[in-house]
Amino acid sequence: MTNAAQLTALLHLASPALPVGAFSYSQGLEAAVDVRRVADEASAAAWIAEGLDVLAACEAPLWLLQFADWQAGRFDAVAERDAWFLATRETRELRLETSQMGWSLNRLIQQMAWGDDALRSALAACASVTFPTAFAAAAAALNVDPRDGVTAYCFAWVENQMAAAVKAVPLGQAAGQRILFGLHAAVARAVEEATRRAACHPPELSTFSPGLGVLSARHETQYSRLFRS
């Protein structure tokens, strides 16, 4: 059971104030707005829910695997899976997004001296680290429960998508909060699915999201944009 210290650590990691630059990315949502795939509250909620399904199929179960390897000191396995995840990002801006956010969180872990020397040294030795790998390292360093940690990861992703929708569509603040509240159950389902996939032998990781890849590629040359992805 998560105690007060662990809960505080989770709230810290999931906070929009975490200095990783998440606010500057929309992960294709802005391109979806540009082509009118997302145009109002209902379509924004549907888009985010579909994106959460994609997250539950790859990034969230990978987070659980990375967390376990960080805790066990299997740093070679962490590096191998991290390289695989980066290779699955289909566009340049998606690769830059996860690399920049991972670098920023890695730097914060070093500055805050989270975790033991071995974990921080392994992170420092990485030429590049993706965001799920860095977030899993931070969660392991702060000794949070893995299920709670991946829940925080998924919720933070949903919250960032909601904030992007409020700016890009645009939507009112109340609409954004309705979207966020309406996706509470979807976050819980995503955690269940991620846990199931991570427990399979071999793990069931699926990166199939052709629509996201196409929209992200379009966004790279979009005439006017607010976000970096």
From Swiss-Prot:
Protein location: Cytoplasm
UniProt organism field: Ralstonia pickettii (strain 12J)
Protein name: Urease accessory protein UreF
Sections of the chain in a coiled coil: none
Matching Gene3D superfamilies: Urease accessory protein UreF
Main location: cytoplasm
Any one cellular-component term (Gene Ontology): cytoplasm
PANTHER family: UREASE ACCESSORY PROTEIN F (PTHR33620:SF1)
